[in-house]
């Protein structure tokens, strides 16, 4: 029987294959004993050998075609007397396999086959993978199950009609065949026809996001048309003030993917500027417009951008074809302003940097004339934790725009919306679209060429509609108004409450006639006093006939000399008595703050219930007034109630003096006394990170019999960005926030980074009950926060692991001649380099977070004012995991652990795929006449005495390959296409597919021949394949953009991604491996270059891989270039050798002078 050995060395088989061999004892398949003079002699003999043994156990040469191994002429073979003691130690691996078959004790000395198999893994690797899988499952489960709020969005009603602006053709833009411009008209509401478009108002342009549709605007546009038709056009005062309809235009980007390709982003911005110019020109044509000819022609357009459409909107203002002041208002929804959503493409990262630098530079100018964006307002609206497409942290513009020109707000903050939204529902949610459209109507002023009010007024409108009114920057109108109501009271009236007493009305209309309750305003000079009023009724404006009106009054005539002789309202409660008190009052309805209703039946803040009305003033805001008048105008008893009081900050504000460590260890517990104010504010500065979730419990302990007017209402808020969340009928709350987030650039204002979370709790103080509050870190829920903040970690950290594994594999290979399996390399890395590198990265992360701080400044926006002041480093959080808190140092080893498990999973998935494909490949080979286990072309030769093979001979091809001419032509064509037409990412995909086929063939041949050299080659190709798989996602996104362009018949080549040097090393490396040629060992000092390159890739993947992932391809490309160099220069570079490498037959040469080698 023809016995098979494992083909392993015999001297070292009893030892671990990773143990170093001594230099004096060559081993492995590349052991060399040169004999130059023997090479031509063997080449000329043409002897073939049969490896069958005779009765003595010795192998004898026989001429048999079915089982002969042809001796390549390059094999350096020395015919020596047999010496069993030294032959196995000195000969290379392939020769040792020949001798092993001739030896009776071959099986005992051979390397066990199970150690060569790529499937087994060590206990350490298995336990690490199991632990990583458990962490990964816990994170994904937490992300899927964490509390994100219910749906809650109303369904909009619309009748859309989209009019294609066919006139916007190639005469106006070079993108006319790719993009399109449309005008929205609401059927049955907007008058229009093909001759006259019915343009009558202010132009608004909608920009869809990444792969988004222009039809997403229909809900906003329909609401604008219906609101104007049903409300605005009937309000003559608003019409006289310049309010008109909104003409919604929209751009069809053909579902282009600007998030993945920087040049596409710039192309869209160029098209938008050309579209804006065309839209403005439409209003000059009286045949297309129904505008009043006395009104000025529009010179500016309002832009609404969804997702990447918001970034395109900001980019338009930086383009060379931008017309100055043609855009002055930008509203974005779920737009990633601060950071690109993915960093896989260099142009996207560079374009983002250029755009953000332009905006920062513009707003850093001292004089408005030097700021091209002085008249621009930017409002960024984020959906919150329900948005699983773009991290809502990235919507922050605090690092770009001062609060005088814009702000960031969450949909859960907007009054009467109070709900988080996902990435798509933010475009159609009924409550949200109503707030957006009402705010737009309030900023429109068609009497101005800009079509909008001045910037300061626009900012006041946006703050009024988008902020709760409880923020420090919220503006109050009370001090800006003149008294318009004269309130006359009887002198002997008992309606004035004693100083400091709380006003409680449990029922309105109890007296069945109008009634007045006066609260005296405390004297000025008492610090921290605050007035609060809460009711379930709506406040009446002057002249309205409702149930409740709140006035702030001063004794008439006014003490400061401002005499007001004309009052629009006169409220007389004196009964005609001569001795009466007259008060000049201001109505406070415009300062009313809506809060979600909180009753025993409330479940969500967005429930369809009439909201509470709330007033809040600091005592300083009431300096001109002596009384607060609450006028109960109900004519019959109602269920309305009211609470009003003046409170001290010492009782109403609680600041928690504990750090993050205290929250983790013991949590926070406190009890509010029964005599507390209606509003209690708890500030926790240590609670600022967006990576941690908390569980808040509120327990009421009733001691009285008085029924509650309302159940506890909680507001969770942070100052920047403006994120507020309301919880009604609160008992148990999951607290998550978008505060200090990873990778975010620092804000322009230093104080924006501090402050922490504030909890405002409204409770009924009239029930004589205490309230217990407890706060604890929710570890399980916090795991889910890692998904959105660190998704791109799984594009970087696995490359760290793979690089260290490859480093270990090449170290062992260069030292011993064995190319160990991926799992063996991973096990070795887990015992040495990987823990040390992760430890070093953890220390670096902690050091960077500790040393991170903002430069001090007295400037309100904290911009550098002179050369001695250090500017803000907006990229300082790009390193490692981007954490600004040293507390999260453990995330580095955690993600390293998870990525080890992910790499193991991908390794086995790849092995399974290769095994399946190899099975079908074997079926094909058997049908084509291939004889199993007889393809011994790899073995260079044999003689009955002893055989020694050079390093060159051991690297022979193990399977046939196309002719070198064909491979050169294919490579040249591919590189030519890369330099002209296709992006190099397409060539990379081709290289991955070709290398997959190489791995399939390598695995099949290794299984069939049971040769260690075959297994070496398979392990080598498989590890390179794993590396290429992890690099593939970095390239696939640009490839999707390119393929999408082909689908929409846009055949203009990319202006970037045609550098052949970015792909040539990969192509040459893959071509070299298609010949079945094993990479030569590097035994000189140059072997350290391999380790250095791979270690550099690992360090870069850890430090910069998340923020600049696109460079990982280029680093891997450098590694591929080095491997190609090893192929070419291992035995000296020459044209002849280059030809032999391409041919895949390094062993065929003729070293004799003047000899000729025939081409195949």
Swiss-Prot record:
Region spans: Disordered: 1-92
Signal peptide range in chain numbering: none
Protein name per Swiss-Prot or TrEMBL: GPI inositol-deacylase
Function: Involved in inositol deacylation of GPI-anchored proteins which plays important roles in the quality control and ER-associated degradation of GPI-anchored proteins.
Subcellular location: Endoplasmic reticulum membrane
InterPro entries to which the protein is assigned, alphabetical: AB_hydrolase_fold, PGAP1-ab_dom-like, PGAP1/BST1, PGAP1_TMD
Residue numbers annotated as active site: 307
Gene3D superfamilies, per database record: alpha/beta hydrolase
Membrane topology per record: Multi-pass membrane protein
Positions of glycan attachment: 65, 866, 1019
Top EC class of this enzyme: hydrolase
Compositionally skewed regions (Polar residues) per UniProt: 57-92
Record keywords: Endoplasmic reticulum, Glycoprotein, Hydrolase, Membrane, Protein transport, Transmembrane, Transmembrane helix, Transport
Enzyme Commission no: 3.1.-.-
Species this protein is from: Aspergillus terreus (strain NIH 2624 / FGSC A1156)
GO biological process: endoplasmic reticulum to Golgi vesicle-mediated transport; GPI anchor metabolic process; protein transport
